[in-house]
Amino acid sequence: MSEMVEKRKKTGARRRRRRRRGKKERLQQILLRMLPVIILMAAVLLLLSFASEKRKNRALQAEAVDSEAMEAEGDIDWFGAPEIDVQLLTVNAYSRPGIALKKVKGIVVHYTANPVSSAKANRNYFENLKDSQDRKVSSHFVIGLEGEIVQCIPTSEIAYASNDRNTDTVSIECCHPDETGEFTEDTYDSLVQLTAWLCKRFSLDKEDVIRHYDVTGKDCPRYYVQNENAWEKFREDVQTRKKDIIAAEEEKKS
């Protein structure tokens, strides 16, 4: 009798061990199935955190504004400004006439229509017009393929860029890698930041950001003339970035 009881105890113990092993194995299987989801969620959270920090850093870039930019633009609110390489043109009749721009009512986006050319090369082309006297053309800013921003003309003066809107707009020329006219990611990001800061500075909304096409019907900037949805997304990105700059500035003041 005692042997039978002992046998039953051993059998019960084996069954309990098997059940525990079975539960452990099932739990491991569940965890293995969930692992990709957990990794994906962690990656998403990391990306969101990185994007938030990146937006905050962009909004705080004004701390590094150099003395040349200060001299070119004067005593203004630099908070949220991107890094700007100031290389002002010589005052001349063909690219920097030195005529006052009394009130900025809009931002005009252009493309260079010269694939692979650099911001520096386009700036130098404007500068050399004083000697070649080929035509009258220029821009306040030129953004390069790596996102570098070169300022050619103070925003207090007109540029020869946007025809009958020269007298009340700031112009931004953008370099591009190919004939499609689509900007690189770095060019795009700098364009959004610069435009958002200018909109904040001059109290403009996204509707005040226009294409050269909207002034003259010219195929400029080509990619945004041919892709209306991409243009509207760009203006939405500008509006969002402008709000980020304002929020960061208010947070800093509080």
Which residues does each predicted region cover?
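N-terminal catalytic cores of peptidoglycan-degrading enzymes
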Residues: 3-162
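Basic/polar, cationic surfaces and motifs that engage anionic cell-wall
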Residues: 24, 28, 33-40, 48-82, ...
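Extracytoplasmic/periplasmic, Sec-exported soluble proteins
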Residues: 99-101, 133-134, 160-164, 179-190, ...
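Soluble periplasmic/extracytoplasmic beta-strand elements of cell-envelope proteins
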Residues: 108, 142, 171-173, 210
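Short strand-loop junctions, especially beta-strand C-caps/beta-turns
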Residues: 112, 175-177
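Short coil-to-beta-strand
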Residues: 163-171
